[in-house]
């Protein structure tokens, strides 16, 4: 199996540490304050200090890196600021230190969940070559040099047991190997979800690849390689292009998919999360889930937020959301739910007849 560990990293956190110490200093003597009050105080003082620095050109130039870090923190959500900058324990490390710690515990480093921090071949070829020259036998060391270049502040490392390390391959990120049979076999096992829209299609130089992605986006953006290749071949036939143009287009398609897998334009799944459909008389929301969401809505949002099956953050939870979660605390019939919807939402509207209220509740249910 694998495990996921996220942590703050040097060298980027050397500057972030200055912001953290400023916020801790601003909150000294305020132990009785709530977490939210401490975050507000830290942000207020940070904004004040930043504004003073900006008033003087010499200070602005000398502290440009600190100002960048401060600006970044000011724009973050309160829960993040509280977690990273006001918690008593925050011990960043370099990637090589993290890797040494893994080795000492019979574990191995696989890569980063942010593939741009691991797949060094997506960068300029000269950069990738230089990193390989600096650390020819160590992927982790190449990434450490990359961290110095990017001033990385945060990593999301994927790790495994040392005994499984022999199966790790980074060939998928190498343009020279993307169209080999082993790499194509790996890519063919995923389901993909396109995150960019049609306006971004101009980035594809190959017309057949562009037409393929346009068709996939119009079809909802979720696909596998069998479907994508079928669309590409149909586009090739429709364009009356020569047979010699098909294989280069297939290679370009694989290259495009891999590049956007790494850069974040395409999500990829070994098992695509299926949407759970509501089933009358069967579906319900366990009380423990409702209680958790209620705790988040009642102030827990300072510390934690909800996410969906794609690991996207869910915004503000409304009273209406909670109401429906509570209504569905056990399986109910449609008639029971529509009556409760009518009584809860529409019965107060005296301008509507009972018949109209029933119709609105029915429409709301559907």
Predicted regions and their residues:
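Long, charge-rich, low-complexity alpha-helical segments
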Residues: 120-135, 140-155, 159, 200-366
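Catalytic cores of nucleotide-enabled group-transfer and carboxylate-activating enzymes in metabolic
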Residues: 1-10, 92-95, 110, 160-163, ...
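Glycine-rich, aromatic-lined ligand/substrate-binding cores of catalytic
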Residues: 83, 89-169, 174-178
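Short, glycine-/aromatic-enriched active-site segment of Class I SAM-dependent methyltransferases
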Residues: 17-23, 65-88
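Conserved class I S-adenosyl-L-methionine
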Residues: 2-62
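Flexible loop/turn segments at secondary-structure boundaries
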Residues: 10-17, 117-121, 166, 275, ...
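Flexible, glycine-/basic-rich loop-and-beta segments that form/coincide
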Residues: 36-60, 162-189
């Amino acid at each position: 199996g694998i495990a996921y560990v996220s942590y703050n990293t040097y060298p980027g956190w050397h500057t972030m540490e200055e912001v953290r110490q400023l916020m801790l200093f601003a909150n000294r003597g305020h132990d009785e304050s709530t977490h939210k009050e401490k975050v507000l105080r830290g942000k207020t003082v940070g904004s004040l200090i930043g504004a003073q620095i900006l008033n003087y050109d010499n200070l602005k130039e000398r502290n440009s890196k600190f100002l960048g870090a401060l600006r970044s923190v000011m724009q973050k959500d309160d829960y993040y600021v509280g977690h990273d900058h006001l918690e008593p324990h925050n011990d960043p490390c370099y990637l090589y230190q993290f890797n040494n710690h893994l080795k000492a515990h019979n574990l191995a480093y696989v890569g980063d969940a942010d593939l741009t921090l691991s797949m060094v071949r997506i960068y300029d070829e000269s950069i990738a070559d230089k990193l390989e020259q600096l650390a020819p036998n160590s992927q982790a060391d190449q990434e450490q040099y990359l961290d110095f270049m990017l001033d990385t502040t945060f990593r999301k490392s994927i790790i495994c047991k040392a005994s499984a390390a022999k199966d790790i391959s980074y060939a998928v990120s190498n343009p020279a190997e993307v169209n080999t049979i082993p790499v194509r076999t790996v890519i063919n096992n995923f389901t993909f979800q396109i995150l960019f829209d049609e306006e971004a299609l101009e980035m594809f130089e190959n017309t057949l690849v562009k037409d393929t992605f346009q068709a996939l986006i119009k079809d909802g953006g979720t696909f596998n390689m069998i479907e994508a290749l079928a669309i590409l071949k149909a586009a090739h036939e429709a364009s009356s292009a020569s047979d010699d143009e098909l294989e280069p287009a297939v290679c370009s398609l694989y290259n495009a998919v891999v590049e956007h897998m790494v850069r974040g334009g395409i999500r990829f799944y070994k098992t695509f999360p299926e949407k759970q459909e509501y089933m009358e008389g069967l579906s319900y929301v366990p009380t423990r889930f409702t209680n958790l969401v209620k705790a988040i809505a009642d102030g827990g949002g300072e510390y934690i937020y909800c996410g969906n099956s794609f690991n996207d953050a869910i915004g503000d939870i409304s009273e209406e959301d909670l109401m429906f979660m509570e209504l569905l605390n056990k399986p109910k019939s449609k008639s029971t739910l529509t009556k409760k919807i009518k009584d809860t939402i529409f019965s107060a509207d005296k301008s509507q007849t009972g018949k109209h209220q029933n119709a609105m509740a029915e429409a709301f249910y559907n």
